Amino acid sequence: MNQATPTKHVFVTGGVASSLGKGLTASSLGSLLRSRGLRVTMQKLDPYLNVDPGTMNPFQHGEVFVTNDGAETDLDIGHYERFLDTDLSQIANVTTGQVYSSVIAKERRGDYLGDTVQVIPHITNEIKERILAMGGTGEDGRSVDVVITEVGGTVGDIESLPFLEAARQVRHDIGRENCFFLHVSLVPYIGPSGELKTKPTQHSVAALRQVGIQPDAVVCRADRELPPSIKKKISLMCDVDQDAVVTCADAPSIYDIPKVLHREGLDAYLVRRLDLPFRDVDWTVWDDLLRRVHHPKEEVTVALVGKYVDLPDAYLSVAEALRAGGFAHEAKVQLRWVASDECQTAAGAARNLQDVDAICVPGGFGVRGIEGKLGALTYARTHGIPTLGLCLGLQCMVIEYARNVVGLEKAGSTEFDPDTPEPVIATMAEQKAFVEGAGDLGGTMRLGLYPAALKDGSIAREVYGSSLIEERHRHRYEVNNAYRDQLEEAGLVFSGTSPDNSLVEYVELPRDTHPYYISTQAHPELRSRPTRPHPLFAGLVGAAIERQRELRFPIDETGLRREPEPDED
């Protein structure tokens, strides 16, 4: 794109109800524009007063997505990264808490020269600065062609008003020809009358107009396709072109949404409206992904043993990484959500895990459900079930091994009991002040991208195909180095450490002991992409498929498969 052409800004708003899929709609549009050869980046404006979601309850907010530079962000940032296949930074997520904190700090410094600080212009100017900052140049010096900004919340909510006003002012500042407003709304189907109702969408657009924004296009979320008559009515009553009324009916997979929007002509309309270079969409990569999604050759069941399974969004990136691991093998991954409490006893673990092909133990905080995670890991280790542990999953893997193999019956973590007699997991030295209450909890963990050196001959080294890797982290606790020798002598392999060997990053069992039993202190799910599955998850699914193929072989007393005797054929 010509460098003289200004960056275009696309704002995505939502109406009628929350959880309509604004983030997925925005991500899919970004994917389409990127497939047309445009440089696209994305941003989320969140109207809550928290500075970031780092200390929020997973049951309320879902997962916390960590960027390379260590920002704790909204889970929609994960959608953006997966659909665009790019890495975003902390400026991709703006919250009301960040905006107000910055404005108040400036006021205290005297930056406003005695002005009365108000929502308009001071808060809105701060928001505008953060929106426009996304349109800078990339590492290669080229400017971004399109910035897609999702405005969180629902039009009409008081919390979103400053963000909507800032977006309106951005349109005024950069020119209408460089700005596009996309409104996502609900068109409900009323069963008894057999009708699709447009009134909620009309009222939602009316509320948007009240704050000075006229949408350029409307994406209608529904459980079925909209007939032309309904589209024509929405076009007339909402004052948008009929070509800009887009149906986005429920799809079999979230990865179908770009095709749905393209079929409806949304990307072509936007490109014409913003006078962007018109190139055909290159479907090469996405078509291959959809083939793997819809036409798998294998199917495996993976148990996700977690504390927050009542809200699957708490493990959104883990679930998507597991599914992507299946795509690598043209396999469908069926997730079984297992509450860790249900695996606290041997009988409970067997009941929930005896027929799964693999197990994933994800991260979390606090003592609740820990004994269940340990029970699940004991079952996985002794029955040869391929297992992947993430963050807390690594710590539980070490505790379980210390108790049941090494003989440290009181092994534990200082997170759960500061006075545990055998702290095989301990607080990181630089984290002790925060844990003891001497500092803020928010934003103070070991966050962001950190390197690890992998041991030759290990599973980790094999699946990564490299001896030095980088992964994103979010933790305060680590394997206690005082117990490393004792654990290694008992057969546990510390297959990856920080380059200076001070922090354990990967733990596993040798392949001759277990087919695939590995964990990492990092969060590799955050770097997985549907088109580039993460090697740890692909390795887990590969091991699960291999185990399926060997199910006809008996299991010996160690829980491992053995070759059948000649008379067993």
From Swiss-Prot:
Activity control: Allosterically activated by GTP, when glutamine is the substrate; GTP has no effect on the reaction when ammonia is the substrate. The allosteric effector GTP functions by stabilizing the protein conformation that binds the tetrahedral intermediate(s) formed during glutamine hydrolysis. Inhibited by the product CTP, via allosteric rather than competitive inhibition.
Chain positions recorded as CTP binding sites: 18, 157-159, 197-202, 233
Glutamine amidotransferase type-1 domain ranges (all copies): 301-550
Pathway: Pyrimidine metabolism; CTP biosynthesis via de novo pathway; CTP from UDP: step 2/2
Database matches in InterPro entries: Class_I_gatase-like, CTP_synthase, CTP_synthase_N, GATASE, GATase1_CTP_Synthase, P-loop_NTPase
List of residues binding ATP: 19-24, 76
Binding site for Mg(2+): 76, 150
Region of interest (Amidoligase domain), ranges: 1-276
Function: Catalyzes the ATP-dependent amination of UTP to CTP with either L-glutamine or ammonia as the source of nitrogen. Regulates intracellular CTP levels through interactions with the four ribonucleotide triphosphates.
Subunit structure, interactors included: Homotetramer.
Additional remark text: CTPSs have evolved a hybrid strategy for distinguishing between UTP and CTP. The overlapping regions of the product feedback inhibitory and substrate sites recognize a common feature in both compounds, the triphosphate moiety. To differentiate isosteric substrate and product pyrimidine rings, an additional pocket far from the expected kinase/ligase catalytic site, specifically recognizes the cytosine and ribose portions of the product inhibitor.
Protein's recorded name: CTP synthase
Lineage of producing organism: Bacteria, Bacillati, Actinomycetota, Actinomycetes, Propionibacteriales
